[in-house]
Each structure stands twice: as structure tokens, then as C-alpha cells.
Regions:
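Dual-mode signal for accessory low-complexity, basic/Gly-rich regions
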Residues: 1-166
Length: 166
């Protein structure tokens, strides 16, 4: 979801930079693409209505929201036999993002063993293919969500993430 209508949120505004009123855009619904972000120029070229995402450099999101799930973070942790909660990354999003390959360094995380937090981890590397992991390895999304810059995300549980230590 991209929503430029939310009050008092980073990147939300009543109008985009081309003067068109912002709205809530459903971009993907249950894994199916539903809409794309456009400005006046892009919309004209594609023969569609603008999505109210015009900026001086082309279309851009206002506030990206990954819709939350039903699980609580506490219940999600209890359901994990062995894993990590990642709170921070450094140098992340290297790899080939266009092909879905994402990797980076976990700067702050907590190790989970037997459904309990067992300690802190840092300076580990992670690697996923976002396309296949979110399609085939998504366990759950929490109902708790965190605002990070111009985005809001729940905690996401993924299976079979490659983690390396040094």
C-alpha cells in the first residue's frame, strides 16, 4: 500500500508535487500486482489515470505500508525453535535488488532458541531472494508495526534465511 493521506506522517501530504490530491493506492493484494505509481507524464504515456505520486524527479511513493498480520510479536517468538530477530542492518540491500537478491550485515539482532530470546547477535551477514522468500518462505506478519522513515512495516518472519558469521 502507498498512502499519502495519513495525517502527521513523513511523506504524507494533501497533494502531490504536481497539485493532484493524494490517495491510498493498493499496489499489491495477496501477491497480485494491482496498481503502479505514476505521475502525470508516466500516466499519460501508459494511458492510465495518475496515482497522485508526482515529484520533480518522476513518480515516487508517499508512505509505503506493508499491511500487518494477526500474530503478536510475543507469540511469533514463542513459535520459533531457532532464529533471529533483526532490529538493524548496515550496508544492507547490496546484491541485485532488481533480481530480488538482498544481502547485508545484521548490526543488531537477538537470537531465539526454543521460543525464548537467548542473547544478542551482531555483525552477521544475511542473504535472501525477496521474491522467492516472500512467496515461498513467509511464516507470518505481526500486528505490531514500526514506522521507519516514510514506511511502516510489521515484523516479518521468514524461513530458510541464509545467515553467515565471521
Amino acid at each position: 500500500v502507498d498512502d499519502g493521506t495519513l495525517a502527521r506522517q513523513i511523506s504524507s501530504a494533501p497533494f502531490d508535487r504536481e497539485g493532484i490530491p493524494t490517495r491510498r493506492n493498493i499496489l499489491i493484494d495477496r501477491g497480485t500486482p494491482k496498481d503502479i505509481l505514476t505521475d502525470l507524464e508516466t500516466a499519460k504515456k501508459l494511458g492510465v489515470k495518475p496515482s497522485e505520486n508526482g515529484t520533480e524527479n518522476g513518480p515516487a511513493p508517499h508512505r509505503t505500508i506493508l499491511v500487518a498480520g494477526d500474530a503478536s510479536l510475543k507469540s511469533l517468538i514463542k513459535s520459533i525453535d531457532q532464529g533471529l530477530i533483526v532490529f538493524g542492518t548496515m550496508g544492507a540491500w547490496t546484491g541485485n535488488p532488481y533480481g530480488g537478491n538482498v544481502s547485508g550485515t545484521i548490526s543488531l539482532g537477538l537470537k531465539i532458541v526454543g521460543g525464548e530470546i537467548a542473547g544478542r547477535v551482531k555483525n552477521c551477514m544475511f542473504s535472501i531472494n525477496s521474491f522467492t522468500h516472500f512467496k515461498d518462505n513467509l511464516i507470518d506478519l505481526t500486528r505490531e508495526a514500526k514506522a521507519l522513515g516514510n514506511a511502516t512495516y510489521p515484523y516479518v518472519a521468514l524461513d530458510d534465511v541464509v545467515i553467515t558469521t565471521g
